[in-house]
């Protein structure tokens, strides 16, 4: 699959699947595009031109070490849109990918067809309690230092309900293990992972949410405990602040609902795309 040298200073790796109205999938912190296979690329590519990327510094997207910001990642993506001539485009942003999607919609109005904020947030201002501070959570840094990056990611996926509910992990251990292997294969290294964590927590767009002037779907699992359980209240608070947005709570799934219940997720997304 191709790479493109961008003026923003990154050799960006991307993949395309299917034909139709374009959709870009933006994954969570530190992950390469591999996590979108087979779900939901397989389902969405039946009717859409699906684009996935390794963001700068992750997987096969090469660039020099540098300070990272959400608006910088968004600029990379917009230049990719220019090269591929794919606008207007549906943006699906999972976790940190939702922050990138918000930045795309705010800074490049008219280029985004619709925005799906999947288990995401707009910044620390929508987080409850002590997590409202604009810095990485103390517990995250402690776990990362104590366990190391690989064990930190493995533990979140295989042991906690951070990505999958206890019920799903017990019933589908093979699916969970395969997701872990896929997620780790081209995962960010320690320096780049920390850059993304810092960029995620430095980002704040909560005060700008009322200025979003496009269709916005907010998806969150009822059992999403990732990030200390902040995604569920953050999703509700974003829905209150984004005019005309639609909030969909997916019962019985956690942060990784794309992979925990791919059929239900694809059905919701296809219904949204048909309407927008």
How should each PLM-predicted stretch be described?
Residues 6-62:
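Conserved HGGG/HGGXW glycine-rich cap/lid loop of the alpha/beta-hydrolase fold
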Residues 51-92, 267:
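Active-site loop/oxyanion-hole signature of alpha/beta-hydrolase fold enzymes
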Residues 152-208:
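Conserved alpha/beta-hydrolase catalytic His-Asp/Glu region
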């Amino acid at each position: 699959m191709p790479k493109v040298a961008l003026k923003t200073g990154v050799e960006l790796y991307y993949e395309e699947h299917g034909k139709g109205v374009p959709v870009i999938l933006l994954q969570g912190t530190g992950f390469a595009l591999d996590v979108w296979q087979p779900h939901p690329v397989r389902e969405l590519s039946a009717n859409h031109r699906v684009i996935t990327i390794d963001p700068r510094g992750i997987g096969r997207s090469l660039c020099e070490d540098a300070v990272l910001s959400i608006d910088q990642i968004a600029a990379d993506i917009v230049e990719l849109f220019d090269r591929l001539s794919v606008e207007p485009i549906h943006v699906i942003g999972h976790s940190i990918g939702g922050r990138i999607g918000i930045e795309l919609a705010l800074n490049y109005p008219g280029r985004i067809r619709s925005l799906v904020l999947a288990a995401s947030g707009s910044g620390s201002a929508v987080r409850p309690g002590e997590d409202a501070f604009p810095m990485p959570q103390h517990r995250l840094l402690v776990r990362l230092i104590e366990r190391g990056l690989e064990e930190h990611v493995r533990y979140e996926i295989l042991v906690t309900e951070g990505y999958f509910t206890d019920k799903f992990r017990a019933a589908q251990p093979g699916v969970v293990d395969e997701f872990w292997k896929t997620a780790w294969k081209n995962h960010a290294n320690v320096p780049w992972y920390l850059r993304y964590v810092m960029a995620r927590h430095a980002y704040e767009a909560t005060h700008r949410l009322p200025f979003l002037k496009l269709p916005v779907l907010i998806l969150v699992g009822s059992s999403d405990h990732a990030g200390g359980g902040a995604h569920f209240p953050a999703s509700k608070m974003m829905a209150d602040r984004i005019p005309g947005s639609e909030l969909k709570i997916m019962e019985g799934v956690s942060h990784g609902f794309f992979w925990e219940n791919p059929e239900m997720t694809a059905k919701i997304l296809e219904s949204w795309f048909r309407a927008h």
